[in-house]
């Protein structure tokens, strides 16, 4: 039935005032529920979400992927960071809403990818508020290989154009940046071959930025090195998926 419709089934069976949605690859800290309860007692909350982190037991590749998926430099802060280039949209790996909001929006659509962002957009379009609960974090297990990670992020790039077709106003500048990265890297590589090798400095400086930032956060040289690879994979895969979807739906007008 897909992730969205499966969540709908569970939500329709639930009897509480609030609904929580978590991915099956997430680990919930002991204080997670208490943090959410306290937030709901403090103020009226329609829908909310929290960030994701890497557990100390995760592999080096998973920690590196966690860096690339959460860093401001690779995502613009849209995945639960306080500093962000886009309004916060709760995502279903760590998301909650009142039963009233769920029933009003009729839950998740049967989309293969991006169904959680679609629901968050519809929640806000209906006039409800969403908020980030920074302390309501989960430990999110990442893909175990870079190959699987590439496929995941490529699908996310494709999904962003599908979301644009449903919600034209949802496409922001930050969503174009991975495509700009892909085109920029190709230009630098071509220029280094035909003009001057110094054009590779731009790519090298970006790699150095990812390395030093990950080293600062993870305190591990191996994770920092893998974070550079993960970050380049993420930006490339998302950018290619985004460009591919633009070509399919914008130029070829596929349905």
Labelled PLM ranges:
Residues 181-252:
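Membrane-embedded multi-pass helical conduit in multi-pass membrane proteins
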Residues 30-63, 136-137, 141:
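Conserved donor NDP-sugar-binding/catalytic core segment of glycosyltransferases
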Residues 19:
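Short aromatic/hydrophobic "clamp" motif used to bind/position activated sugar donors
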Residues 3, 7, 32, 93-94, ...:
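Conserved donor sugar-nucleotide recognition element shared by glycan-biosynthetic enzymes
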Residues 1-14, 35, 85, 89-93:
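Glycine-rich, basic loop-to-helix element that forms the pyrophosphate-binding segment
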Residues 54, 77-100, 112, 118, ...:
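A recurrent flexible, glycine/aromatic-enriched loop bordering the glycosyltransferase active site
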Residues 23-27:
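The conserved acidic donor/metal-binding loop of glycosyltransferases
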Residues 109-171:
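Catalytic donor/gating beta->alpha subdomain of glycosyltransferases that bind UDP-sugars
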């Amino acid at each position: 039935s897909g992730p969205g419709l499966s969540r709908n089934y569970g939500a329709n069976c639930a009897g509480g005032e609030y609904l929580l949605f978590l991915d099956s690859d997430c680990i919930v800290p002991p204080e997670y529920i208490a943090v959410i309860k306290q937030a709901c007692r403090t103020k009226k909350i329609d829908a909310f979400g929290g960030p994701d982190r890497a557990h100390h037991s995760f592999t080096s590749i998973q920690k590196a992927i966690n860096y690339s998926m959460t860093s401001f430099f690779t995502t613009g802060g849209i995945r639960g960071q306080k500093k962000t280039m886009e309004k916060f949209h709760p995502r279903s790996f760590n998301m909650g809403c009142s039963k009233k909001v769920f029933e009003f929006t009729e839950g998740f659509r049967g989309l293969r990818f991006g169904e959680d962002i679609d629901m968050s957009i519809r929640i806000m379009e209906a006039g409800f508020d969403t908020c980030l609960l920074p302390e309501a974090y989960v430990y999110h297990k990442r893909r175990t290989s870079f190959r699987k990670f590439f496929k995941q992020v490529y699908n996310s790039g494709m999904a962003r154009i599908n979301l644009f077709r449903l919600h034209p106003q949802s496409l922001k500048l930050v969503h174009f940046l991975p495509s700009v990265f892909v085109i920029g890297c190709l230009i630098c590589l071509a220029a280094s071959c035909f003009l001057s090798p110094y054009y590779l400095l731009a790519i090298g400086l970006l790699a150095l930025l990812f390395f030093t930032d990950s080293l600062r956060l993870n305190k591990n040289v191996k994770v920092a090195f893998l974070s550079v690879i993960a970050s380049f994979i993420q930006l490339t895969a998302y950018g290619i998926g985004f460009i591919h979807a633009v070509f399919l739906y914008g130029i070829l007008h596929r349905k």
